[in-house]
């Protein structure tokens, strides 16, 4: 079964973007490259079990096993030594990427309290969009009763767009609810 967002991209979004930005070739149209989910677990320094819980939650949210990130440098103020595990991240590509974006836009973001749309100022100048989520509970896979601690995560949507304008238009066409 083909993904709904991928089919929409090929049938509707590509022609719309070609018209809007006057591309000479369909290959110039920006597309999603990957979505990176990152969960920093600073309290893993004192209790390694917290990292295991974060890895488990990220696995449920993304559908694939996360990579444990480690400290590059030692920082005495944080009681951190080089090489200590301090977070987890997942790179989503292909079908899983479209599945996750679909779920994010249509299920998870509407579950955020006092949600008025995502910020339009989170583009990085190279066509990538970063979104911070304050609590992992907005995802339907996370069972509220099994959560010991509310954790946030960063979601980076990497596109092949050259400018923020093109990237924003691409995400708007996908249905990303930007704040007015």
From Swiss-Prot:
InterPro entries in UniProt: Ribosomal_uL5, Ribosomal_uL5_bac-type, Ribosomal_uL5_C, Ribosomal_uL5_CS, Ribosomal_uL5_dom_sf, Ribosomal_uL5_N
Cross-referenced PANTHER family: 60S RIBOSOMAL PROTEIN L11-RELATED
Name this protein carries in UniProt: Large ribosomal subunit protein uL5
PROSITE patterns xrefs: RIBOSOMAL_L5
Classification via Pfam families: Ribosomal_L5, Ribosomal_L5_C
Originating gene: rplE
The keyword tRNA-binding is assigned to this record: yes
Cellular component terms per the entry's GO annotation: ribonucleoprotein complex; ribosome
Family: Belongs to the universal ribosomal protein uL5 family.
Function: This is one of the proteins that bind and probably mediate the attachment of the 5S RNA into the large ribosomal subunit, where it forms part of the central protuberance. In the 70S ribosome it contacts protein S13 of the 30S subunit (bridge B1b), connecting the 2 subunits; this bridge is implicated in subunit movement. Contacts the P site tRNA; the 5S rRNA and some of its associated proteins might help stabilize positioning of ribosome-bound tRNAs.
Assembly description: Part of the 50S ribosomal subunit; part of the 5S rRNA/L5/L18/L25 subcomplex. Contacts the 5S rRNA and the P site tRNA. Forms a bridge to the 30S subunit in the 70S ribosome.
MF GO annotations: rRNA binding; structural constituent of ribosome; tRNA binding
GO biological process terms, semicolon-separated: translation
Keywords for this protein: Ribonucleoprotein, Ribosomal protein, RNA-binding, rRNA-binding, tRNA-binding
SUPFAM superfamilies: RL5-like
